[in-house]
A protein has these predicted regions:
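Residue-level recognition of beta-strand->loop/alpha-helix junctions
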Residues: 39-43, 103, 128-130
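Cofactor-binding loop segments of dinucleotide-utilizing enzymes, especially the Rossmann-like FAD-
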Residues: 1, 104
């Protein structure tokens, strides 16, 4: 199925520098000039919660100061998600000095409860995000222009993209 996404950064950000990870890196560099953010798309883990975490992200997680777990929207199996998110949290804690976890952008009580439980039982900072989508108009619209990986503009024509946060929404997630 063609989902009309021609980029490798946060879906619905108009350009790479406006996705959540790149905006976060820019903010961190104001206070710690050599900060780097390494975005990892682990949607494959969200869709297959039993896949091997180490083979998916292990090489990227070694000796990090902080890992931010920002996922949940692609999780389909909410029955096994509570155990899976706890395993992911423990794995990340074994690799980084500090781990922070966010809730989902799209409100889903079941997923949110699992994330909150994992945060509380592992003494993590939890940052809710669903309020952004509920309170602000931070989704792109049909007809808005985005850019592909070659910086070529294209116009949004499908509804799938407009369920994701736009540049402003990405900024709010980063903050």
């Amino acid at each position: 199925e063609d989902i009309e996404w021609f980029s490798d950064w946060g879906m619905a950000a108009s350009n790479i520098e406006y996705d959540y990870c790149h905006q976060l890196e820019k903010m961190l560099c104001k206070y710690h000039p050599n900060s780097t953010v390494t975005p990892l798309n682990i949607a494959s883990w969200e869709r297959n919660l039993s896949c091997d975490i180490d083979s998916l992200i292990g090489s990227y997680c070694k000796n990090k100061d902080i890992i931010i777990i920002r996922l949940g929207e692609n999780v389909q199996d909410v029955t096994t998600f509570p155990d899976a998110i706890s395993r992911l949290v423990k794995y990340c804690q074994s690799k980084a000095k500090r781990v922070i976890i966010t809730g989902c952008f799209w409100k889903n009580d079941s997923k949110e409860r699992s994330i909150i439980h994992a945060a509380r039982t592992n003494d993590l900072t939890y940052v809710p995000l669903y309020w952004i989508d509920n309170l602000y108009n931070v989704r792109p619209q049909i007809g808005d222009t985005l850019y592909d990986i070659n910086k070529k503009p294209y116009v949004i024509t499908q509804d799938f993209i407009i369920t994701h946060p736009n540049d402003e929404g990405m900024q709010m997630i980063a903050e």
